[in-house]
Amino acid sequence: MKLTCVVIVAVLLLTACQLITADDSRGTQRHRALRSDTKLSMSTRCKGKGASCSRTMYNCCSGSCNRGKCG
């Protein structure tokens, strides 16, 4: 019973800390452009038109690989 109470109190404390930290960090992002570029590069992992490709790996943005080049 004591262990259950300790776990419940710990979870409530951690939740409260998360909420307090989230409120304090609003509007304090310093390098917005850098972050958005990083997100963009992480989300687009496909290759553009004319890049080398393999038929076994579908890594072209267009979805087609003809003669080793993205189409």
From Swiss-Prot:
Keyword Repressor: no
Principal cellular location given in the protein's record: secreted
Location in or out of the cell: Secreted
Modified residues (Cysteine amide): 70
Tissues of expression: Expressed by the venom duct.
Entry GO terms, CC: extracellular region
Pfam families linked to this entry: Conotoxin
GO molecular function list: ion channel inhibitor activity; toxin activity
Keywords, ordered alphabetically: Amidation, Disulfide bond, Knottin, Neurotoxin, Secreted, Toxin
Cystine pairs: 46-61, 53-65, 60-70
Keyword presence, Secreted: yes
This protein's domain notes: The presence of a 'disulfide through disulfide knot' structurally defines this protein as a knottin. The cysteine framework is VI/VII (C-C-CC-C-C).
Any further remark recorded for this protein: Found in injectable (milked) (IV) venom.
Family: Belongs to the conotoxin M superfamily.
Known function: Omega-conotoxins act at presynaptic membranes, they bind and block voltage-gated calcium channels (Cav).
Protein's name according to its UniProt entry: Omega-conotoxin-like CnVIIF
